[in-house]
């Protein structure tokens, strides 16, 4: 197909033999926009057993990749305005704040954020998935219906 886009983007997928909520209770990640050819990804997940695991990746100009020290969760930012979905964030070297809520559903939030890390102020994309909430019967009953999205700029 003839596809093209402008701006930042990413591709992700989930694959496995069991439903995600059988293994994970949730996860959140933050991906910074590049500054001087450097971008960060902070990824934290929690298994249904309560075990937590994190990953920090630093991408550099020219395709370099370095694995960093996993960051614990920092103070959460404000929950989403409609469904009150939590938005935990990794404990970077400075405060994080919401710039704009892009997706606000009962179990999922996507937000544009301001993040301070390693002495730089980054604009970042943040995602949080709450699979405990996803598994609740009231949320399951809502799944056939599309959740409203905010208008794109």
Question: What are these language model-derived features?
Answer:
Residues 1-153:
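Structured soluble/peripheral alpha/beta segments that form catalytic or ligand/cofactor-binding pockets
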């Amino acid at each position: 197909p003839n596809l093209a886009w402008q701006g930042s983007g990413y591709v992700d997928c989930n694959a496995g033999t069991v439903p995600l909520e059988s293994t994970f209770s949730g996860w959140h990640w933050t991906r910074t926009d590049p500054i001087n050819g450097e971008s960060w990804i902070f990824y934290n997940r929690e298994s249904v057993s309560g075990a937590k695991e994190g990953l920090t990746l630093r991408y550099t100009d020219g395709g370099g990749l370095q694995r960093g020290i996993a960051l614990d969760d920092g103070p959460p930012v404000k929950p989403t305005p409609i469904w009150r979905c939590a938005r935990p964030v990794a404990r970077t070297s400075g405060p994080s704040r919401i710039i704009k809520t892009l997706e606000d559903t009962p179990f999922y939030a996507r937000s544009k954020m301001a993040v301070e890390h390693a002495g730089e102020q980054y604009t970042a994309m943040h995602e949080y998935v709450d699979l405990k909430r996803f598994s609740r019967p009231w949320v399951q009953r809502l799944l056939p219906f599309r959740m409203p999205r905010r208008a794109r700029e």
